[in-house]
């Protein structure tokens, strides 16, 4: 057996055992948040990254957010060890948003349960619609078509919108240029596809977004670029639900059957955190 194969098997076994332990701890009241439920996961054969590398020369910052920077503070040659100083906002690069990001009476990053960070994944492919309309809003009909093709969506799931906009990841290079800020369309201003408000309500009504769950996307966020009230995000961020933003490599996941897990620092009263996101593929 190749070393890489052994590593994947070991990771899968460790992950499955960890999920069982964490779910049991949450269910017994030992978790940091308000409880949890048992989680049953399949065996996994492959692990993939779903997050971008944070490179200050490449990373596109959301308009108005703190600028990301990396500075070398210590080197092996001079100090005997290497360390960088990181300056960033909580919503830098690939990241998650906690419910308190939009609501003063909801949970923050340090109050979530460990089981909140491990979810079955649903990948909804709207690349064709996005190519025709960069401001496309995924509809209830899109979700129902997914169900017709793949069967019922799991409860408390991570619903990931695959738009293809991550292909244009990079800084803003000025008006009229091909960039992440317009999903490669060359249009001026801010343009990206997202979920329609009706589709988010449908996911909640169906229990796909239940006590747990999230909306994820390979854009700046779940909201269409022309929705400056962020209604889709606001509706999602309640109870133990998240949004995952600036994802990449969604083509590596099957439409159904994979799981995702992610993590970052647990800042006190954090509104979210930059995250490394993993796709776990059966």
Describe each model-derived feature in a short phrase.
Residues 9-18:
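Bacterial N-terminal signal peptides
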Residues 2-8, 21-282:
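Active-/binding-site microenvironments in catalytic and ligand-binding cores
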């Amino acid at each position: 057996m190749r070393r890489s194969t052994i590593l994947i098997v070991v990771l899968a076994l460790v992950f499955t055992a960890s999920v069982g332990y964490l779910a049991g701890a949450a269910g017994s009241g030992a978790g940091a948040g308000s409880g949890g439920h048992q989680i049953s996961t399949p065996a996994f054969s492959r692990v993939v990254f779903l997050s971008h590398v944070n490179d200050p020369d490449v990373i596109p910052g959301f308009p108005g957010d703190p600028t990301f920077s990396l500075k070398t503070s210590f080197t092996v040659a001079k100090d005997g060890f290497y360390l960088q100083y990181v300056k960033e906002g909580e919503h830098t690069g690939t990241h998650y948003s906690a419910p308190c990001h939009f609501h003063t009476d909801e949970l923050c990053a340090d109050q979530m349960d460990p089981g909140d960070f491990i979810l079955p994944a649903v990948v909804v492919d709207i690349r064709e619609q996005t190519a025709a309309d960069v401001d496309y809003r995924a509809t209830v009909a899109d979700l129902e078509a997914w169900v017709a093709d793949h069967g019922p969506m799991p409860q408390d799931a991570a619903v990931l919108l695959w738009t293809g906009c991550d292909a244009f990841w990079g800084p803003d290079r000025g008006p009229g240029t091909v960039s992440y800020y317009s999903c490669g369309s060359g249009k001026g201003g801010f343009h990206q596809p997202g979920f329609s408000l009706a589709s988010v309500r449908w996911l909640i009504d169906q229990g796909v977004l239940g006590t747990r769950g999230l909306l994820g996307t390979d854009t700046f966020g779940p909201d269409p670029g022309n929705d400056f009230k962020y209604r889709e995000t606001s509706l999602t961020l309640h109870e133990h639900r998240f949004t995952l933003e600036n994802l990449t490599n969604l083509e590596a996941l099957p439409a159904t059957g994979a799981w995702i897990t992610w993590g970052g620092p647990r800042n006190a009263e954090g509104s979210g955190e930059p995250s490394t996101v993993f796709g776990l593929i059966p």
